[in-house]
Amino acid sequence: MYAQPKLTSAEYVQHHMSHWKLNLHNFTFTDGGFWTLNLDTLIISVVLGALFILIFYIVARRATASVPGKWQNAIEMAVEAADGTVKDSFHGDRSLVAPLALTIFIWVFLMNFMDLVPVDLIPRLFQMGGVEHFKAVPTADPTLTFAMSITVFVLVIFYNFKMKGAIGLGKEVLSRPFGWYLMPINVIFRLIDEGVKPISLALRLFGNLFAGELIFILIALLPWWSQFTLGMVWTLFHLLVITVQAFIFMMLTVVYISLAAESH
């Protein structure tokens, strides 16, 4: 990892923290404010999602009941771990929630893992193709983490209606936690409680990966003889961070859906 000699330290950091943007108003590669699509986030997340599906598909096609290979063993362990986690928290039909939990964990982990790729490698490759800015860690982009957390929020609402019905959910919102006499306060508390969930879910993942990426960029600015040692130390620690953050996102998703699915 090394910094470009033409850039100052501040410019180097700014360059690596900038996205490849598409303005959805006029479809030019400029900043369109709210109507901006971060192409780098889209490309990397879709490629990693496709890679995840392809690997699982190939291993499933070649699965054997006799002597499983290393890939089959690893995937079976991941599937059993995800199913066991869901079973401990969610007591309804797991046919949707268990695959969702597995998908979230693997996909988020793969996107987090991009933080361990040398900071100059992928941006340099795209720079050869004329792309000035390219940020290779999708989960360090709040637009992606908020998109995922909002999707979880929609699922929570879906399970609320599915398990309790419109009338049952309405009664719960109006009467809890303080009883019918304090309905306005109950509604306010419920709105705050439900609104905080997707925000905290998104910001927790984004904050940890953004900070991790920034530290790698700062390490790349150091003299070459210190980059390897500090880079290895931070990589080993960050490997734990990216795994834990993927697990937390998966676990909180399951917990939120489980709470929504509980009928009272």
Curated annotation (Swiss-Prot):
Top-level taxonomic group: Bacteria
GO molecular function, a single term: proton-transporting ATP synthase activity, rotational mechanism
UniProt GO cellular component terms: plasma membrane; proton-transporting ATP synthase complex
Membrane topology, as annotated: Multi-pass membrane protein
Keywords: ATP synthesis, Cell inner membrane, Cell membrane, CF(0), Hydrogen ion transport, Ion transport, Membrane, Transmembrane, Transmembrane helix, Transport
InterPro entries according to UniProt: ATP_syn_F0_a_bact/chloroplast, ATP_synth_F0_asu, ATP_synth_F0_asu_AS, F0_ATP_A_sf
PROSITE patterns according to UniProt: ATPASE_A
Stored CDD domains: ATP-synt_Fo_a_6
Role noted for this protein: Key component of the proton channel; it plays a direct role in the translocation of protons across the membrane.
SUBUNIT field: F-type ATPases have 2 components, CF(1) - the catalytic core - and CF(0) - the membrane proton channel. CF(1) has five subunits: alpha(3), beta(3), gamma(1), delta(1), epsilon(1). CF(0) has three main subunits: a(1), b(2) and c(9-12). The alpha and beta chains form an alternating ring which encloses part of the gamma chain. CF(1) is attached to CF(0) by a central stalk formed by the gamma and epsilon chains, while a peripheral stalk is formed by the delta and b chains.
Assigned protein family: Belongs to the ATPase A chain family.
Protein name as annotated: ATP synthase subunit a
Organism, as annotated: Coxiella burnetii (strain Dugway 5J108-111)
